[in-house]
Amino acid sequence: STPREDIGASMLITEDLSPKVNVPVEVVPMEELEKVLSSSNNGTIVTSRYFLQPLEKVAKQYGVRAIAVDLSDFQKELTILKKLSTGSCVGIVSISPGLLRAAEVIIHSMRGSELMLMTAISDNSSRLLSLLKASNHIVCDGPSLSVVENTLLKNRSQLMRLPQIICAENYLSTETINQLKKEIGVIN
């Protein structure tokens, strides 16, 4: 669960967890969580550390657990970005506005103004197209990859060059997924 304004983060968590835990995983915005829990007698709330404190109160009220998951360290992607030539234009595409904001801060702290950064939510087609036209490299999350690839295919004639696509395979760290599996009792 995350706030409605960044439900994309919940969707990324769900995308990583669903195939790895053999229990139903449902995306519920924080604003609707009490309503959902009032009609259910069990469950586990999974969120990022940023939202754990308010969700622990809700969990306690309804007798369920709230567990924070840790994000990937994105070392593969950051290593690639560290090696890019000064002046390169990098596009970041995600379903999560929170992830985009965090990525911008991290990349700026790492490279300063050496790289030109552009960001787009994957469902904002006009902004995405502008980003694809300008960028040498695109970093995207898993759910955005097909949108990026389809937009590139549809608009190839408008592009001077095809950008290199770097897809972040995991949103959550492997360790946090394994820990969560232990917590909920689904270790293989």
Regions found by a protein language model. Give the residues of each.
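C-terminal regulatory/effector modules of DNA-binding transcriptional regulators
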Residues: S1-N188
